[in-house]
A protein has these predicted regions:
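Metal-dependent amide/peptide-bond hydrolase catalytic core
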Residues: 4, 11-15, 21-201
Length: 201
């Protein structure tokens, strides 16, 4: 496949804080976990049905004891979009969604940006043609895909770049992730063909 377009992303840590307390005696006090849950549901609604953007939540935590109100609930959040403008708008929507949830539940809110990757495309026609020819040499056709790869660092600086590779595998980021080792040799041949096509080596 060929990643010819950088998928923009912003990674955040979301923290909601309350006073804590006893699960029964302080049951009317603000509850950060329910605030976090509501915020996440609001955020999920922002990308429902969209093909150009996504949101993912992971690393949820909050509380230590089942009979105590947690003082804090937190999660890691990543938003992605194909265009910078869409990414900026989605990020604003995420901030507003959590602000509304925090206000409704009377808890504190802290959003920390952990990292950013820009959306964009810098691959030149020559680079794209070289990738297509290199894949043809190993009997493959290019699958042009957006993605978040190491090429994003070059794209951010305006340097012509793309992500390129050939392998057989599946189940990405799951316990069942797999790759066929012999397919990596095909990928190696394609990479060497790409470098030759660009006059490198």
């Amino acid at each position: 496949g060929v990643v010819d377009r950088a998928l923009g992303s912003v990674r955040l840590r979301v923290r909601l804080q309350g006073p804590g307390g006893h699960a029964w005696g302080d049951r009317r006090l603000p509850h950060p976990v329910f605030a976090l849950a509501e915020g996440l549901c609001r955020v999920r609604a922002l990308v429902e049905g969209r093909e150009d953007a996504s949101v993912n939540a992971s690393g949820l935590e909050g509380g230590q004891a089942v009979n105590a109100l947690p003082q804090e609930a937190a999660c890691l959040l990543e938003v992605r979009a194909l265009e910078e403008a869409a990414l900026a708008a989605l990020l604003q929507g995420v901030e507003a969604a959590f602000a509304e949830a925090a206000r409704a539940h009377r808890v504190g809110l802290a959003l920390e940006v952990l990292g950013r990757r820009p959306a964009g495309r810098t691959a030149t026609p020559r680079l794209l043609q070289a990738a297509e020819r290199a894949l043809a040499e190993v009997g493959e056709r290019p699958q042009w895909l957006p993605g978040s790869t190491d090429a994003s660092a070059a794209i951010e600086r305006g340097i012509p770049a793309l992500g390129f590779g050939v392998y057989r595998g599946g189940g990405a980021h799951t316990p069942g992730e797999w790759v066929l080792p012999s397919s990596l040799l095909e990928g190696q041949r394609a990479l060497l063909a790409l470098l030759r096509g660009l006059g490198v080596g």
